[in-house]
Amino acid sequence: MEGVTQFFQQDAQLAELLLDYICHTLYADKTAAGEPVNILKVWEGPQFLSSFDRRQEGYARYEEQGLIRTVETIGPADHSNAESSMTEVTADILASYEEGEIDAIWCCYDLYARGVYAALKEVNQDIPMVSVDICNADIEKMAEEDSPWKACATTNWSYNGEFGMRVLALELAGEYDQILDPMTGQASNWLELPASLVTHEMVSAGGIDVSNLDTVAGTAYSDRSWMPTTGWMTELLGD
């Protein structure tokens, strides 16, 4: 949009981090043997939501490389109660597949993932699942012993608002050349915030929520090197 600065999560990267984890951690042997990992995909289809479409771009790259095969794509039948709807839809779909036909479940959105999680518990199937975005309810479910919910991909929530305020301050100061896209390092009015992977192992000890996620989520989650700044801002804020 001409003349308007926009910033987003790096949605394609969110999708790719999860698929990389599936292919190279959960199913490393299968991937090394050149076999695609069979994915039940939870997604809405094109043009439902722009962020979902950007996540699809990352997903599509793994399909194109032959690293994954989409067994089926599902989504909620009732958006007024999407979580419960996903539980029903997922349970019905799982009943139509034999054990081992689905290697993992990839979810474009954590609200839908909570419904998938409930379905896996309901039908007592041990299929690993991953999702985009994170909240305290997700962390609680991921932290359970033997949880099927293996990973979430997310940006650092505490940084997102600060990033927006720094960008606004730089615009008010007329320093547009200091507003850099974190993913490219180039001045831009289209800005994408980098993603991190949070795994079951990181939160399984308990006592973790989004307020202290930085204590277990690794250096990528806590990295601030891409935060926009300039001389006067560093003097005022310290970085």
Task: Outline where the language-model segments fall.
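Glycine-rich, charge-decorated loop segments at or immediately adjacent to ligand/cofactor-binding or catalytic sites
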Residues: 1-2, 135-149
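Structural recognition of the beta-strand scaffold that forms the well-ordered cores
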Residues: 1-8, 38-43, 71-72, 103-108, ...
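Short beta-strand elements in bilobed, periplasmic/extracellular small-molecule ligand-binding domains
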Residues: 3, 38-41, 59-83
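Hydrophobic alpha-helical segments within soluble ligand-binding/sensing domains
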Residues: 6-37, 84-87, 135-138, 155-175
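Short, solvent-exposed amphipathic alpha-helices that sit
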Residues: 14-18, 49-69, 85, 89, ...
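Hinge/cleft segment of the Venus flytrap/periplasmic-binding protein
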Residues: 36, 42-43, 163-239
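Extracytoplasmic "Venus flytrap"
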Residues: 43-53, 107-110
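Hydrophobic alpha-helical
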Residues: 58, 75-141, 161, 165
